[in-house]
């Protein structure tokens, strides 16, 4: 059976760390920022890690 292809859309949006975690950027940053609080905008600058439940679904795509 041939190897599964990596999903290009996911490959462009995430990075896999050395420990195997999936690192991603926060959503809701691109526009309409005047409606968001300072705290929301500041916290969305940090990257976050994918939750374990999501990781189980996405590991087959990478």
Curated annotation (Swiss-Prot):
GO terms for cellular component: cytosolic large ribosomal subunit. GO terms for biological process: translation. Transmembrane segments: none annotated. It holds the Pfam family Ribosomal_L35p. PROSITE patterns: RIBOSOMAL_L35 (PS00936). One of its GO terms (molecular function) is structural constituent of ribosome. Keywords: Ribonucleoprotein, Ribosomal protein. SUPFAM superfamilies: L35p-like. Disulfide bonds: none annotated. NCBIfam families: rpmI_bact (TIGR00001). Belongs to the bacterial ribosomal protein bL35 family. This is Large ribosomal subunit protein bL35. It comes from Mycoplasmopsis synoviae (strain 53) (Mycoplasma synoviae). The lineage of its organism: Bacteria, Bacillati, Mycoplasmatota, Mycoplasmoidales, Metamycoplasmataceae.
């Amino acid at each position: 059976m041939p190897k599964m292809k990596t999903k290009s859309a996911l490959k462009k949006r995430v990075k896999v760390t050395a420990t195997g975690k999936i690192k991603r950027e926060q959503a809701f940053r691109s526009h309409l920022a005047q409606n968001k609080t300072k705290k929301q905008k500041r916290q969305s600058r940090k990257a976050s890690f994918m939750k374990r439940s999501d990781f189980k679904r996405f590991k087959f795509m990478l």
